[in-house]
């Protein structure tokens, strides 16, 4: 095992990788509850989506670990599932079967451009300082997600965002968990993020026994054997509906391609920066294999009946406790497969109050990449700042990346350095502009 995953070379060991994999899984476990709820709004069966989500995440994560040796787990992505349910099925009126067809086709296209090296070429064309901004931006983004999920911040019609209800016991639990986790990190406690999550969950369960509502609880039955994949294979039956209007079909498939491509790119770049997978030329090690795992996961997930499977930025939680190899991803994958049986226990104990502190602390760690940006150079300062701020304000990793690329290209033109812009970056800038112009085109 040590030779296969190169544990010694990566400065890790089996125990650390197992803990990291479990930590990543716990940080991602919310998707097992959220994804079925979101896709149910498109008319899909919750139980079926839960099963498809768990199995596809397990298989894709294990594939990632074995083929790419990356500590990055995969599952049905947030954001892209909302695109599936509320835009493709809601606003555009497609059935969920047709939407699954679009996911399946986008996955096939991903496999082709991953095998041919096109995806790697695009990622490697991103300027190094933009990669740092993307990594830091994702850190701010997941910290924002953690704060929102915990209820520490809430939406406000007057100020957009405001402080949450600090008298809510679940909000207080998340705050206590955050402070505990920060203290553990400062004290250099091994697996501090994971330990913080466990302590938070235990405190919540105890408070639940004392009668406080909304706390993590222990279920009556820890194991379930109620399985049914109602949507399996539906991606094939929806193809004719999808292509009834070829232009709309193109828009739908392109939307899935765009969101998954750059969410994945951002995640891999961010984690690659953290663990030294990016060389002096700014190239990502084993990029083809990691991107192929993402593409295969999407195809497999579509066949089972779930939205696009993508690399999860929450994998940085596992990296934060020492995960450095594919054994971390394999461990997370096994946990997802076991989750098929342990759904009652997982959904009742791993609440937002438990995962939020981990997301916030890891966000703090990832934000440190900002120090690598040359803030005296207005080109990178502007592009980096816009990348970070737009990820948060638009609540979208891919939109933040798109804005950063556009600003970077325009800034290079203004500085008289247009010839230094990589051809791939020019092409991406044009695609990003067209992406934002899609509502006007439609």
Question: What label would you give each PLM region?
Answer:
Residues 60-72, 182-188, 255-263, 294-304, ...:
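Transmembrane alpha-helix interface/packing and boundary motifs in multi-pass membrane proteins
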Residues 1-35, 56, 76-86, 90-138, ...:
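Helix-loop-helix junctions within the multi-pass membrane cores of secondary transporters/permeases
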Residues 43-62:
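Loop-to-helix transition at the N-terminal end of transmembrane alpha-helices
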Residues 1-48, 162-163, 197-288, 433-434:
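Helix-loop-helix hairpins and the membrane-proximal interhelical loops
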